[in-house]
Curated annotation (Swiss-Prot):
This is Sugar fermentation stimulation protein homolog. Belongs to the SfsA family. HAMAP family: SfsA (MF_00095). The lineage of its organism: Bacteria, Bacillati, Bacillota, Clostridia, Eubacteriales. GO terms for molecular function: DNA binding. It comes from Clostridium botulinum (strain Langeland / NCTC 10281 / Type F).
């Protein structure tokens, strides 16, 4: 998917809270919005180069969103709104192998008391619920989720097990917001409960998928499947 708004580079200064950061643009310090509640501490390092997206909205306190950052030569997308958009584009273009037969794609659908990112249907009426998680944490080719404790994430995994137990298809797709990685694994040290829930989901037949992305400063798209170790 293309990012159609104005994109520019800046130097990262600091992040005083989850939603705000300070950057330097042409020697001027400016506050920007961070569209990611994760820690991203391996990416948002003082002095590093980050990518901003200009938001032309007079009602905003900040002019820019901080949407990506360079970790060495590697560009990592950190915009938490991006994964669902990338996966939707991939689903519409039948790029996810095991989901190619699902032709009716609906976003943000509920099942019981649960809300999932996607509800997919085949022409024969078979239903599949898909949850998407964005991944930004990487170390020497190993990617992990989450980078902060996530009760909500664990709840989603357990709800997918319930979907599967009721006879429908269920899966979670970890969208790795960078390219050229070797493996994905749950971050047991950060959130043991999430890791255990994911292991149980796999045992119960929930599909566990991971894909990396082709990331450029003004575009991002689904790339290749990544091996998973749970």
């Amino acid at each position: 998917m293309k990012i159609t708004k104005n994109i520019l580079k800046a130097e990262f200064i600091k992040r005083p809270n989850r939603f705000q950061a300070y950057v330097k643009i042409n020697e001027k310090i400016e506050m920007v919005h961070v569209p990611n509640t994760g820690r991203c501490k391996e990416i948002l390092i003082p002095g590093s180069t980050v990518i901003l997206r200009e938001e032309n909205n007079e009602n905003r306190k900040t002019r820019y969103d901080l949407i990506a950052g360079y970790k060495g030569d590697m560009l990592i997308s950190i915009d938490s709104q991006i994964p669902n958009k990338v996966v939707y584009e991939a689903l519409m273009n039948f790029k996810i192998e095991i989901l190619k037969e699902y032709t009716n794609i609906k976003r943000e659908k509920t099942f019981g008391k649960s809300r999932f990112d996607f509800k997919l249907e085949k022409e024969n009426g078979e239903v599949y619920y898909l949850e998407v998680k964005g991944v930004t944490l990487e170390n020497d080719g190993l990617t992990m989720f989450p980078d902060a404790p996530t009760e909500r994430g664990t709840k989603h995994i357990l709800e997918l097990i319930d979907v599967k137990n009721k006879g429908m298809g269920a899966g979670v797709l970890f969208l790795i917001q960078l390219n050229g990685v070797k493996k994905f694994t749950p971050n047991h040290k950060m959130d043991k409960n999430f890791g255990e829930a994911l292991k149980l989901a796999k045992e119960k037949g929930v599909d566990i998928l991971a894909y990396d992305c082709l990331v450029e400063e003004s575009s991002i798209s689904l790339n290749n499947p990544v091996s998973i170790e749970i």
